[in-house]
Amino acid sequence: XETYGEPGNTPDDYVHAHNNIRRVLGMXPKXQGAIDGSSXVQLXLDEXLDYDYNXNKXIKPPGNVVGQLPY
């Protein structure tokens, strides 16, 4: 079995913690997907193209990726 160090650090723990906050904010939950590390890094790099670092905000609205719902 895989270990993640301290209790509360599994991928499911992170998804659960985010969804607790999303629920408080009235947002739909996120689910853990089956994306590999390289793809996750590429998604983050691609999103950086749509970010205005001087104004510290996204240039495009959340959910600008085809097939994804807004945050």
From Swiss-Prot:
Keyword Glycoprotein found: yes
Alphabetized UniProt keyword annotations: Allergen, Glycoprotein
Modification(s) after translation: Glycosylated. High-mannose oligosaccharides (Man(5-9)GlcNAc(2)).
Taxonomy, superkingdom: Eukaryota
Glycoprotein found in the keyword field: yes
Note: Consists of 6 isoforms with different pI. The IgE-binding epitopes are not significantly affected by the deglycosylation of the allergen.
Protein name as annotated: Allergen Art v 2
UniProt lineage: Eukaryota, Viridiplantae, Streptophyta, Embryophyta, Tracheophyta
